[in-house]
A protein has these predicted regions:
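N-terminal catalytic or cofactor-binding beta/alpha core of small enzyme domains
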Residues: 32-308
Length: 308
């Protein structure tokens, strides 16, 4: 085994408690997929792909895309009655591309329809249509064994997130987590008039779960950097707490566990980068939004360093 991977394996095993093998060895990671300078792949039991990918970088700025995944696995798929197009329309496809230039990235591959990591544990498995945009998800109520397995995934993710953030905190003192999502604005149908711009900004910044005054230098600098950019020839519309207020579980978790040192900013991109009904992406738009978000990384790093 090369010395580099020996060090990586030792660090992963110490931080997670999981047995780990390195690329080129006989067995893959036993638990989840990681990227640490190089990707390490895994297939979990039941045919599901790896739960998430983490790429660790040298920066106090972290980008996450926890709703980008669409994997439900064969076992879960057999329990579902929701058509794939309906399910995928409520996921956040392509958001992993928006954080591709972030030093540290956390990307979840599991669909929110199996377990929603941005909801509190007790609401993380959708049990009724009122939890899932009026959509019927299951052929019949999921068995408690299945629910418990899904909640174990929720627990494992937040346990790992806490370890990663604690390490970043130890190294830099403070950190910023940019929690990237997307939202639909043509809910009445593919040919319907889109939602009014007044209530549907291109980028909605959610800050309600943070100490807004404390983190004003960071959030204000972030929003100013975004507002200085143009999209399709027009200034990008960036507003705070309009359609979403940043009340998801991930931002709450960060501020509850790192109240003095962690700033989690919820960022909702309107799906102006794709056809939300067909699922077809506009790769040019995705690349422009990716570059826009990438431009905020040095701004956030400077803002964090400047806090006293």
């Amino acid at each position: 085994m090369r010395p580099f991977w020996r060090e990586v394996r030792a660090w992963l095993q110490a931080s997670t408690g999981w047995p780990v093998q390195c690329p080129g060895t006989a067995h893959p990671l036993h638990a989840f997929r990681w990227m640490v300078s190089k990707p390490v792949y895994n297939n979990n039991r039941g045919g599901t792909s790896a739960g998430w990918t983490i790429k660790l970088g040298d920066s106090p700025v972290i980008g996450t895309a926890i709703h980008s995944g669409s994997d439900v696995g064969r076992a879960c798929q057999s329990l579902m009655c929701i058509p794939d197009p309906d399910r995928q329309r409520e996921e956040d496809p392509f958001t992993e591309h928006f954080i591709a230039d972030f030093p540290t990235q956390i990307i979840v591959h599991r669909s929110r329809f199996q377990v929603d990591l941005n909801r509190a544990r007790e609401a993380a498995v959708y049990r009724s249509p009122d939890q899932s945009w009026g959509l019927n998800v299951w052929r019949e109520p999921p068995a408690e064994e299945f629910v418990n397995e899904s909640l174990a995934f929720h627990d494992a993710f937040y346990g790992e997130l806490k370890r990663v953030l604690a390490d970043v905190e130890k190294r830099y003192g403070r950190f910023v987590l940019v929690d990237v999502h997307s939202y639909n604005h043509r809910r009445e149908g593919p040919k319907a008039v889109p939602a009014s711009q007044d209530g549907a900004p291109d980028i909605n910044i959610g800050t309600s779960s943070m100490d807004r005054a404390r983190w004003a230098p960071v959030v204000d600098a972030f929003m100013e950097a975004l507002r200085g950019r143009r999209f399709n020839g027009e200034p990008i519309d960036v507003r705070e707490n309009v359609l979403f207020q940043g009340k998801g579980e991930q931002t709450r978790f960060v501020h509850a566990n790192f109240p003095e040192t962690g700033c989690a900013i919820a960022v909702e991109f309107k799906k102006i980068f794709m056809d939300e009904w067909s699922g077809k992406p506009d790769w040019g738009a995705i690349e422009r939004l990716r570059a826009m978000l990438a431009s905020t990384v040095p701004v956030l790093e400077a803002a964090v360093r400047g806090m006293t």
